[in-house]
Structures are given as structure tokens and as C-alpha cells.
Amino acid sequence: MSLPAAFLRDAQQLIPQERRFDDPLSTLAFGTDASFYRLIPKLVIRVESEDEVVALLQLAQRDRVPVTFRAAGTSLSGQAISDSVLIVLGDNWNGKEIRHQGSQIRLQPGVIGAQANAWLAPFGRKIGPDPASINACKIGGIVANNASGMCCGTAQNTYHTLAGIRLVLADGTRLDTEDEASVSAFRASHGPLLERLAELGRSTRANSELAAKIRHKYRLKNTTGLSLNALVDFDEPLDILSHLLVGSEGTLGFISAVTYDTVIDHPNKASALIVFPDVETCCNAVTVLKSQPVSAVELLDRRSLRSVQDKPGMPAFVQQLSANACALLIESRAASSSLLHEQLAQIMNSLAAFPVEKQVDFTEDPQENAKLWAIRKDTFPAVGAVRKTGTTVIIEDVTFPVEQLAIGVNRLIELFDKHHYDEAILFGHALEGNLHFVFTQGFNSSEEVNRYQAFMDDVAQLVAVEFGGSLKAEHGTGRNMAPFVELEWGSDAYQLMWQLKRLLDPNAILNPDVVLSEDPQIHLKHLKPLPAADEIVDKCIECGFCEPVCPSKGLTLSPRQRIVIWRDIQARKRAGIDTSELEAAYQYQGIDTCAATGLCAQRCPVGINTGELVKKLRSEHATHSGTADWLGSHFASTLQGARFTLHVANGARMLLGAPRLSKLSASLTRLSKGRVPQWNNAMPQPEKAIRFSPSVSDARPRVVYLAACVSRVMGPAAGDKEQSSLYEKTRGLLEKAGYQVVLPDNLDNLCCGQPFASKGYATQAEDKRQELIGALLHASRGGLDPIYCDTSPCTLRLVQDLGDVRLDLYDPVRFIRTHLLERLEFTPQEAPIAVHVTCSTQHLGESQALIELARRCSNNVVIPEGIHCCGFAGDKGFTTPELNAHSLRSLKDAVQYCSEGISTSRTCEIGLSQHGGIDYHGLVYLVDRVTRAKAV
């Protein structure tokens, strides 16, 4: 069925065209979330204000159009997909208000969970929920799912730390529980609804058997069904309503803002890994630890340990553990080091009577801690990495009463064996009896679907009926467990949930078939295919963890969406379906606007670099190999041509003036489809070719200086206050520190190959790289001298897969911190400095080092929030300027009190200067300004 014409007409008047999507590519891309279900929406709307949400809900109510809300799309149970209208959050939902020295924080639903904690960190506080997806998931989803996590338990989830909420009901009515005027207006307009909620609360509390059941169920971690505990925990109907919205998964209303009572984030922590000989011993230890000063206790069965035993950094003994071994990863936190040590002694004393097979003692070392927690965090992706192409990874989420945890674990393992899930692993938040089990599942045949159905029926019977546990502890009911809500809760509680749903959403327009469904087979419908597409991306589980760092997300596609569309294209081709229209749209949205810098790989739990797929696809369309060969073998001429182009651009600026040239250039770029680069105010002037011969008899320590080709071509912008070139500044700083600067021979013909690689000419790129490596070996006297490269992208290109261990290569950050700190005296400036950590700096592992260097140089360092990749991507800032503009759309406000920024990439600095409204320079400019040579 299509959407009503009246709804579409009025929605078009309400929402601009650029925020409405109904084309096949966009609806498929947005139709995907992290669950193993898929629905294709008929219309996707990106909303930027509460007023728009209100108006859309009023339209949906009028025309009986179902709507679903989406924040980050990282939920796992099918609660954020729709075959009707999908409403997704735009940029303008990132507001915050920190109160009372961080003891409270008010957040809009588009804030990423980790960002909220970053804001609270200076106060030693954090929000209570700590889901594994906290670096990607957003507050809207955290609240709507009542997400918890490893340390959160039940006491610190959203329900129990809720201080206030702003919501929109299905009829478009707003309520802000922290605004007296809003509350008064709501009481006047919705008095009967509030009285009905109060009545349901009274009758529930009066039903002693039902009330006792509700209290018992929420003693455990539980997100199955609606939050009935609101009816027994509160008398005031506004409190009931606000807490019903928590965990409602978008079925009762839209959450516009939430205020949390924050929790203490203790600075001192230690972790240990203790392996017990069997499940029973391990779970008995959990019972003891529940009364100990522990912040997290994670259980890992033998299968989960086996899945990561070959990973780097794993304790060697993991490979030799016995067949029934079961481990606990324990963390304790405290306000002081002395208190932490007391707690650790107390914890170990409590476990003294238990037999232990192996253990890693408590450590406070951050790196060792990270290694231990990597065991836990790598288990889920470990299954994903070995799954058969075409199957999906399913992670289920149940709770047993802690005192029955050992029996529950063994019974689950029996079900794995019964239904032939041999690869299934089991781990979880042991203190709460909350277990996750991960397995691979194909849905390509009725036999596989039937196997899954039989398994889930057995799991539901085991957990909900035999043990009285929770079928969803923290992942939300979604579609996945909707058919089992009545089985877990019983008829009285189930009907009570339906009463609440019909009271708050009488026309059933809010996320139908989620949490509550009249279809007993809903969990077996709309199962998502994961067809083979390319071995580079076939392991993708579509979790969405990559999306926050992608510069094109919100402009075109995210890495997850690129993979989704490419999978669909390949599946259609195999089925003989025409894909020309989809591929034509994908060329721009999937290929042309991908920065291909690979930050997505850093966030991906299975290490997928979607940029590599894009480069591969570009190579298939790279039809000018002969030209690339000529450019590579005549590189000095190529650079001279680039300098000439900059001369022409600079002349045009002086002739036409910057405003007219900018307008003309934008038109030419658009008409030429990116073939003519777009001019902007930060466009560099041409740099003269380097002419430099060091003294032969120089006795100073040598450093080989590799000036990247962009540094050799691009000088400062005409309007830049700093008119010294990067080469001049770098050479001056190195000599100030007492180094003899040596340049490779034939420098103007040398290149790392990055310009060729980014265009899909891999052969020419590698030829140039190898030529440069040979020149650097010669210049460094066989690797005797360190090699300084003045841009981090060039350094990264050289060190990746570097076979020759003789070369000692440095980017600016690493060289300054390892070679120059001891030779220079720093006098930090008071003027604020903005820092952009480039993608390559992140890949090189120098992010924190760059920030620390900046703090040596300035007492006021500004790191803009939410900008991970600038989107300039070599030359895309010239040819696809909208990518750079989109990625840096928030930069100007973030750096408004700075007069200068620093980076480690000359091309990135062009876009940063243009969109930040301040001059960005290389790190060496700042270091040179605030240092002098130390007296010998």
C-alpha cells in the first residue's frame, strides 16, 4: 500500500525536499539497522526540530500513517525499522545543559552516549547507562531501550536515573516534566489520560500477586515488554507516564530531551582475569562477588575464550585451558588509590576458597587493563569474523536469577548442542545474571528458519518459564521477542501493557508490531539478507559503529549504507535484475563522496575498511592507465603543471576578485562534475621548487627531510597572515634543534603514490611508493638516519605494509615528541589554538600525542567536537567540495574564539581554513613560534 496522498502533500509542504527520501537507494539504505530484520520505508524524513515532529505526528494521526523513530540505528531487536514512514534525527538534536557541577545533565536525543560522558568527564561524572555501542548509539535510543551495559546494572539505568523528560505523544501534544507551564497545560488538556494512568497504577498496586511479579521481574535486568514497574513505583501519573516512555522503543511517544542524574566515574580502577575449572565454580564465585566492591564482573565461557585465544595480546595460557573452563573478568573502581587497594584485597579474600585454573592478577596499568577488556570486547566480532558468507550474526540477551546462573548457563549450552549451533559463544554481565549468546544463522532456506524458530521456542521456554528470567535484559523487545512477551509475563500483565498502548496510542501509529504484536510469527518475518558482495566487506554485520566518524554520513551514505547498497546490487545482478538505475545513483552517493580515509575501520568490530571497497570500485572505472603511467614517470613535470595551475588561479583572483572567482569557480566545478577544481579563499599560492644543498662537512646529527609533493607545490594562501612555507618552517625548526637537514636526491620526481591510489590506480601508486622508498634508503644511508615526512598522510602511506625494516620513518608528531622535546625549550602561548587530528594521525596512533604537544605550546587548546575526518580527502575538497563543507559544517562555531588552528596535512588545512574562518597551519608553525634551542 502507498501512503495517503494527503499525508504526502502536507509532508512535502512541511519538510524541505533535501530532507525527504523516497528513492530506491535511500529507502533501502535507511531501511537497515543493526538488527537481523529489514523493512523498506516508503518515506524517510530527516527532522531538525520538535515542531516538525509535532506536525508530522498530527498528520500521521489524521491519516492513520504508522511512523517509526530512528536515532543511530544500533539497536538489535528490530525496533528501529519501518515499511511506512521512518523519522530519523538530523543535526539539530545535539543540545546539552550541564547542571549542578555535573550532577545532572539534560540531553537531546541526538547526542552520542560517549559524547555525553566526555562533557561530564571534567566533573568526574558519567551517565549511568554504558552499553557496548556507547561510541555510536544516541541518547534517544538509550532511553527508548532502557539500555544498560557492563557496569550499569539495574540501579544506574535510565529508568532509575531519570530526573526529567520532554516528550511528544502520538497526538502531537508536548510535555516537559521540568517545565511548570508545560505540566499545567498538559494536566488541563489531558486530565482524563492522567486519571486513567493513576487508576491503572492503583489497580496494579492493589493486585498483590501482579505487583509482586512486577517487582520481582525488575529485580532482574529486564527490557521485555513495557515498563510496568512505573505503575508500582509511582503514584503520581506524570511520573508513571515519564517512566513508561523509558524502554517503550518508540511505541508510546517521541523523546525530545531527557535529564539524567549522573553517577560518579571513579578515576582509580583495576582489572583481573580469573579462570575457574568449570561453570558451576565460576557462577558460585559470582554469587560471592555480588556483595563485594566490584564495578563489573563479566563471564566468558570456554567457547568465547577459544574464539579470541589467537588474538594479539591474549594471555598465552588461554590456548591451554581445559574444556570446561569458565572465566570472570573483574573490575573494581574507587575514589582513591588506597581505597582501591583495600577493595582488591577484600575481593581476592572473598575468592580464596575457590579453585582457580589460571589467573591474571589485578592490574592498574591502563594498557594491561585494555588488553584484558579486549578479550571481552573481541568475542562478538570474533564470531562475526568467521561466519559463513550469507549468514548473519545474532546476539541474544537473557537474564537468569543469579542464584541459578550455573544451571542456566549449562542448560543454554545444551540447547546450542541440541540445535547444532556449534560456533555459539556465551558471555555476559554476571552480577546481574545477564547472559549474551552469539551464534551465526542463515535465513536462506525454510529449514534454517525452522531451526531458528525451534531454538528460540526452546530458549523462551527455558528462560521465561522454567527459570522466571528475562528474554530481553537490555537490548529491547523489538520484533524479536514481541511474540514471547505474554509467555514471559502472563496474561494479566500482558493485557495491562496493551491497555497502556491503546491509551497512549489509540490509533496504533507508533511503531506497530514492536514490543507488542498480535502476530505470533512476527519474529520470523522480514528477515534481513546478507548476500555476498565483496570479500572486503562480506564480514560486515551492519552494526553501525562506523557511522559517527564518516564525513559523508548525512550528506550521502555512511559506510554501513555503502555496504548495504553494494550487497543489494550484487544480489540483484545474480538474480538477473537490472541494476543500472541503482548503480547510477550509487556512483555519486557511494563512490564519489567517500573520503576513503579508512576511519570506519578503526570503529568496525571486524576491522572493515569500506574505503578499500570504494578504491577497488574506482579502480574498475580507472580507464586512464596510460595517462597515470606518464604522470608517474614525469612527476616533476606534473608538479610543475600543478604549480602553473595555482599561478593561474592566483592571477584570476587578482584579476576578478575573490567573490567573483569563487562564484565562477563553483559553477565550473558543478558543470564539469568536479573536473574543474573549485577555488576558495584558502586556496594556496604556488610554492617554488626546493633548491637546497647542505654543507658536506656538517658534523650535526642528520635527518632526512621528505617534503611531501603537496608541500612542494602548495604555499600559503594569499590571505594567510603566515607567509612562510611549510618547507621553510620545517627546515628552520629542525636546524634550530641542531639537526643537519638532508633531502633525497631527485626530490621533485618523488611521491608516495597516494594521489594515484585514491583515484584507483594501484599499480602506479605502488610503483611511486617503491621508487620513493629506494630514494629514502639511499638518503638515509641505508636507514642509519631518521626520516622526517612533513605530512601525516604521506607518512601513513609509506609505513603501511612497509617491508623494509631499515627505514626509520616519522610523521611530524612522532618526530617532535621523540627527537625535539629534549632539544627545545617551550614557552606556551596564551592565545587559544584549534587542533585538528587528521585521519592519518589517528591511523598512526599519534592522536593523543598531537593534543599533548599542542598543550605544551598553548594554555588554551580547542578540539572541535564531532569532527573526525574533515572530508578534504586529498583533492575532494576541490572536486567534491560539498563533502568537505558537510563534514566541517560545525567547525566555525567550534573555533570562533581561536585565531589559528593546527594540523598535519597541507590539503586538510585548506578546507579547515575555508570552513573554520581561521588560518590552519602545520604543527611545526606553532612549535617553532613557542620554542627556542636549549643551551648546550
Where are these regions (language model features)?
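N-terminal flexible segment immediately upstream of the FAD-binding catalytic core
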Residues: 1-62, 72-103, 251, 255-269, ...
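N-terminal glycine-rich flavin-associated loop
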Residues: 11, 35-67, 85-131, 143, ...
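C-terminal substrate-binding/cap subdomain adjacent to the FAD-binding core in PCMH-type
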Residues: 142-144, 148-158, 162-377, 410, ...
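Activity-critical C-terminal alpha-helical subdomain
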Residues: 382, 483-532
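Iron-sulfur cluster-binding electron-transfer modules in prokaryotic oxidoreductases
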Residues: 505, 611-936
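Iron-sulfur cluster-binding cysteine motifs and their immediate structural context
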Residues: 509-514, 545-568, 593-620, 797, ...
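Non-heme iron-sulfur electron-transfer modules
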Residues: 516, 553-586, 607-633, 919-928
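Ferredoxin-like iron-sulfur electron-transfer modules
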Residues: 522-542, 574-596
